[in-house]
Design a protein with these regions (language model features):
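Class I S-adenosyl-L-methionine-dependent methyltransferase catalytic core
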Residues: 1-179
């Protein structure tokens, strides 16, 4: 019996700290074509990250830091692709949502797998959060490696919090009652 599910496993070794750089320019295009970002910080990568490089290429001032829990960040928007490790990803996202709610930044955009918001434990990030603005579903699978040897196996979405509201699109409702 086969025990390795190809839908879950890519066949590649995991990168240290899940440091998958967002090198596919379509990801940033999907975000910036709908939301005006004046300047940004990527809290999960130092300068030279894929997100920082792509934003700068579009003429948007951007920088990166490697500590998502730093006290102060400099930028109107946080734009990031957090690591996938369950033990840390929710802490990182919740810390960035706190920055939005306190007014330290105008907005937050996180790039995560489409099913990220399906977890009951994340209900507070989305349905119960008035700063949650919506999502941008990308109708392509981002490429994470320059070699072109592998096809991505997961769909991705930008989740948005902050002053920007995505209007003219269907509302998302999270239903979690079991009875």
């Amino acid at each position: 019996m086969k025990t390795d599910n190809n839908y879950v496993r890519s066949g590649r070794e995991r990168l240290v700290d899940d440091n998958y750089q967002t090198i596919d320019p379509r990801c940033i295009l999907a975000l910036t074509s709908l939301i005006k970002i004046t300047n940004a910080v990527d809290v999960c990568s130092p300068n030279g990250s894929g997100i920082v490089d792509e934003l700068q290429e579009k003429g948007i001032p951007a920088c990166g830091i490697s500590d998502a829990f730093e006290e102060i960040v400099s930028g109107d928007w946080i734009v990031t692709n957090p690591p996938y490790q369950r033990s840390i990803v929710d802490k990182i996202v919740n810390r960035q949502i706190e920055r939005v709610e306190s007014g330290q930044v105008k907005g937050l955009a996180i790039l995560v797998r489409t099913q990220f918001d399906h977890a009951k434990t994340r209900w507070g990030m989305f349905a119960a959060n008035t700063s949650y603005a919506g999502q941008i579903k990308m109708l392509f699978r981002p490429k994470w490696f320059e070699d072109g040897e592998s096809t991505p196996i997961h769909n991705y979405v930008w989740h948005i919090w902050g002053e920007y509201k995505i209007v003219g699109y269907p509302a998302r409702i999270w239903y979690w009652k079991e009875h």
